[in-house]
Regions:
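Feature activates predominantly on carbohydrate-active enzymes
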Residues: 1-99, 105-109
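A general structural motif
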Residues: 3, 32, 73, 108-110, ...
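Short, Lys/Arg-enriched charge-dense amphipathic segments
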Residues: 58-65, 99-109, 134-136, 167-181
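Short, conserved phosphate-binding/catalytic loop or strand-edge motifs used
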Residues: 109, 115-117
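Catalytic-core regions of glycoside hydrolase
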Residues: 9-10, 118-211
Length: 211
């Protein structure tokens, strides 16, 4: 597997900074190469404050996590979860770019967008792909030292994914920049990796799923 690591993307009490630092050493020891930071209860990752900069203390913690990842040869990926209240307009696009630039200044060089577990206009896959493609052009490629984007789609499990050509996964496959990786959890939220589920999703997103 190209990506071997951990996604901190759960609900409830997030890990403490000390636990995260210890786990990064663990990842390095056991040859993991990716730590994706996206705890749902981090208000500056998700609603209501994803548009705002991290306070000084929290920003310092992010820097320490990045340095720990470098020491352990682990890619630090910072995720944002804007979908519950994002507006598909220029103002919120610039809010997102501004937040990415703030995180870039902290040392982040790999980014992810989560559109999971949301409702309302944020679930629109056409708007999601337009946003991701524009970010790839305006931010990732213009920086020159930022890794490809990763996205968690609203339909991240076969359990509720729309399998038709009008479904979000098929729209991703037809319109999403091929450099962007797409999360997939399998037949259910926590499931085994099987050839059948990979064939099912890969044929729709037209790329190998990020599992």
């Amino acid at each position: 597997l190209k990506n071997r690591g951990v996604v901190e993307g759960f609900y409830g009490t997030p890990w403490s900074h000390e636990v995260r630092m210890s786990l990064i050493d663990f990842y390095g020891k056991f040859k993991m190469n990716s730590y994706l930071y996206g705890p749902k209860n981090d208000p500056y990752h998700s609603c209501p404050n994803w548009r705002l900069p991290y306070p000084e203390k929290e920003a310092g913690n992010i820097k320490e996590l990045i340095e720990a990842c470098k020491r352990n040869r682990v890619d630090f990926v910072w995720a944002i979860h804007p979908g519950q209240d994002i507006k598909w307009n220029e103002e919120d696009y610039q809010n997102l770019v501004n937040k990415f630039n703030l995180m870039y200044d902290l040392g982040v060089r790999a980014f992810a967008l989560f559109f999971d577990d949301i409702s309302g206009e944020g679930t629109n896959p056409v708007k999601q792909t337009e946003l991701l493609n524009r970010l790839t052009k305006d931010f990732v490629k213009s920086k020159g030292d930022v890794a490809y984007l990763t996205v968690c789609p609203t339909d991240y499990s076969k359990l509720w994914a729309n399998p038709t050509p009008q479904g979000s996964l098929a729209i991703y496959g037809e319109t999403l920049d091929p450099s962007i990786e797409v999360f997939w959890t399998g037949d259910v939220v926590c499931s085994d990796l099987t050839p059948e589920t990979l064939d099912w999703v890969n044929s729709r997103i037209k790329r190998p799923a990020y599992f």
